[in-house]
């Protein structure tokens, strides 16, 4: 969810905002603002470093002063939730869970995210697993020290402590059954925080909402249904280019890819680790998921990346209200039929 240095921006900037929140604004800002003004609405957008990445909150609301206050409150909400769900900050509830192996009377937000994480682990047959943290730490330490992957025997040893089925979650306590286990919510918490922030902005009266948290994006508000946002999906072979544009009218989108945080130039080793084998998945280059929840899009894009094109695409087609695209290492694109309805 974040790096230790909050000022450091994550490289996981997979999607960019186009149309109203990106290219169209750069090319026609006056026209867009004129249309919003004539409707008696005001557009406010603010960018901050949060959750270890760039976060852009854009809203349209009836009153300018109120809109600015909404955006400030949105970042305050993110800060509060990050203080619960981060493993990188000291003395957060998640940090204490990893330190002790259990936490009594955990915050309800941590219970909710952990519970959902275990659900996605089950849905993906363990391809998404929040107990992968020890493997991530192993790879990070070896590449930082020697720019080389860890030896196989170390991977095999650490792999014994990775198993979502050894986590117990309820409102009274969260328990890790092995003393070697650690949890990372990096692949799900950012989406959860974005979801909660969008809901808060809707409750506050924002007409249109778009939040981009380093590629985890969510739209909301009645205005987004009537006038969807247009989002560009990056081409993993040429990350400065786009594979497609899709409309978000209340939906959420997330992408996982081997090019975002690669340990090696050939992308053989990257920041996504298969929790079942201990190595980076080798078949998919990028996975984009569009669904009704940023948390779900976040978790599923990671899990499907690990599952690979065949199993991952089958899962994507089975899930309700879920569309997406898988790009293989060979450059082939596999797109669900429903994504065409969202394409621009």
Q: Which residue stretches match the model-derived regions?
A:
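Mature catalytic core of soluble alpha/beta enzymes
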Residues: 1-344
């Amino acid at each position: 969810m974040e790096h230790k240095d909050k000022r450091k921006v994550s490289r996981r900037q997979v999607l960019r905002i186009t149309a109203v929140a990106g290219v169209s604004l750069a090319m026609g800002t006056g026209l867009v603002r004129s249309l919003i003004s004539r409707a008696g609405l005001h557009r406010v957008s603010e960018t901050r470093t949060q959750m270890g990445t760039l976060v852009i909150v854009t809203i349209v609301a009836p009153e300018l002063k109120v809109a600015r206050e909404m955006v400030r409150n949105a970042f305050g909400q993110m800060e509060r939730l990050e203080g619960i769900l981060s493993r990188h900050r000291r003395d957060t509830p998640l940090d204490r869970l990893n330190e002790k192996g259990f936490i009594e009377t955990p915050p309800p937000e941590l219970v909710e995210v952990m519970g959902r994480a275990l659900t996605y682990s089950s849905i993906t047959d363990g391809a998404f697993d929040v107990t992968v943290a020890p493997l991530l730490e192993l790879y990070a330490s070896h590449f930082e020290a020697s720019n080389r992957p860890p030896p196989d025997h170390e991977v095999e040893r650490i792999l014994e402590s990775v198993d979502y089925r050894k986590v117990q979650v309820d409102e009274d306590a969260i328990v890790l059954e092995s003393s070697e286990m650690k949890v990372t919510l990096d692949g799900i918490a950012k989406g959860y925080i974005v979801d909660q922030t969008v809901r808060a902005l809707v409750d506050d009266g924002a007409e249109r909402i778009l939040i981009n948290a380093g590629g985890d994006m969510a739209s909301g508000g009645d205005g987004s249904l009537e006038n969807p946002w247009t989002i560009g999906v990056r081409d993993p072979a040429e990350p400065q280019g786009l594979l497609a544009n899709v409309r978000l009218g209340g939906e959420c989108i997330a992408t996982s890819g081997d090019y975002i945080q690669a340990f090696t130039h050939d992308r053989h080793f990257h920041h996504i680790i298969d929790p079942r084998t201990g190595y980076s998945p080798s078949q998919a280059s990028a996975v984009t998921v569009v669904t009704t929840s940023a948390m779900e899009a976040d978790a599923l894009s990671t899990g499907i990346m690990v599952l690979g094109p065949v199993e991952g695409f089958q899962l994507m087609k089975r899930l309700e209200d879920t569309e997406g695209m898988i790009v293989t290492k060979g450059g082939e694109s596999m797109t669900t039929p429903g994504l065409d309805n969202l394409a621009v």
